[in-house]
């Protein structure tokens, strides 16, 4: 999303009315470690810079570098948590946040992150992530059980219709929980979640998809056989890439794929025990069934259909 839509006047005022020049530089280095206000401004090293001038320079530079939203997120965190044991009261920060929202972003209070307004656009990077950015996320792997048999037994037109319906169901469930559909293959998909309680969002999305497909099999499936899905959810750190191929190489994605292939059954969602114990008891009660593969333990949610 283009930075030119930000007015930045509220940010400049917030900086010069709340922080010293040293603090401004310290905080901008949290999003751009190589930032040098003297090199960027042309001032001789060590030359005194007025507080308001420093605020203008830093805001201009961080905007040019495409890191303005990251900087605002940093200010929000410092205002709420402090820095190095010191509390900061950043005056006018609500106006700074409002300016970003006015520019077309939404704000997630759970993770203190801005993301694109889903009423205007939906992109795989939430309108924020750049290649190399690291985030904590949950990923959901989906596989169509018995895909080759379905393709063999049904006409191409019917397969395209049914799989198109499946994609709509999956996309709606993921996006409605602030996730993104990262890949869609002939027999599977990958969803990513990084906002709100992202692990729970991914798990609930997977459960919803399974139940929606059970209903679809009963009321709208044009194929000769039911469409049965195997799903898994795993969470952890990931380095974002705009390349779908590179994303599939990420450790948490590979673990989700392994989890699905090893432990998931048709019409089931599997999560690792390490992920399960981070969830609330109400959700754990739903995942009361456990499976063990080799030495690994998993929790499984499964829905039975009429002919099972």
Task: List each model region and its residues.
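Regulatory cytosolic signal-relay segments
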Residues: 54-134
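Catalytic NTP-binding/metal-coordinating core of nucleotidyl cyclase/transferase enzymes
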Residues: 126-201
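Catalytic beta-strand-to-alpha-helix segment of the class III nucleotidyl cyclase homology domain
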Residues: 3-68, 194-308
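Long, hydrophobic, amphipathic alpha-helical segments used as structural scaffolds
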Residues: 86, 90, 177-178, 217, ...
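Short hydrophobic/aromatic-rich motifs at helix boundaries and adjacent loops
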Residues: 118-119, 139-144, 181-185, 227-231, ...
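A broad, low-specificity signal for short, low-complexity segments enriched in glycine/proline
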Residues: 96-103, 151-154, 192-194, 228-232, ...
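Short, flexible loop segments at the rims of nucleotide/cofactor-binding pockets, characterized by
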Residues: 117, 159, 246
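Short, structured coil/loop segments at alpha-helix boundaries
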Residues: 83-86, 105-108, 115, 155, ...
């Amino acid at each position: 999303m283009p930075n030119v839509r930000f007015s930045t006047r509220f940010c400049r005022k917030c900086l010069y009315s709340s922080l010293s020049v040293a603090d401004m530089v310290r905080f901008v280095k949290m999003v751009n470690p190589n930032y040098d206000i003297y090199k960027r401004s042309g001032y001789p090293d060590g030359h005194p810079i007025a507080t308001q001038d420093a605020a203008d320079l830093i805001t201009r530079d961080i905007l040019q570098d495409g890191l303005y939203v990251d900087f605002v997120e940093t200010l929000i965190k410092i205002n709420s948590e402090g820095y190095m044991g010191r509390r900061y009261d950043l005056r006018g920060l609500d106006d700074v946040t409002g300016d970003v929202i006015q520019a077309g972003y939404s704000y997630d209070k759970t993770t203190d992150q801005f993301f694109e307004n889903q009423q205007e656009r939906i992109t795989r990077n939430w309108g924020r992530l750049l290649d190399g950015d690291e985030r904590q996320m949950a990923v959901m792997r989906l596989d169509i059980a018995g895909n080759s048999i379905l393709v063999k037994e049904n006409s191409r037109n019917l397969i395209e219709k049914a799989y198109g319906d499946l994609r709509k169901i999956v996309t709606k469930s993921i996006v409605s929980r602030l996730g993104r559909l990262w890949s869609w293959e002939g027999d599977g998909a990958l969803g990513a979640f990084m906002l709100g309680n992202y692990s729970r969002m991914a798990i609930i999305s997977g459960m919803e998809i399974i139940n929606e497909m059970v209903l679809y099999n009963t009321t709208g499936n044009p194929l000769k056989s039911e469409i049965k899905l195997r799903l898994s959810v795993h969470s952890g750190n990931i380095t974002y890439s705009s390349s779908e191929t590179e994303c599939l190489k990420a450790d948490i994605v590979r673990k989700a794929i392994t989890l699905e292939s090893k432990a998931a059954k048709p019409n089931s969602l599997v999560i690792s025990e390490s992920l399960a114990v981070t969830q609330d008891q109400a959700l754990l009660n739903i995942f009361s069934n456990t499976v063990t593969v080799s030495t690994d333990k998993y929790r499984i949610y499964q829905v039975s259909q009429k002919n099972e």
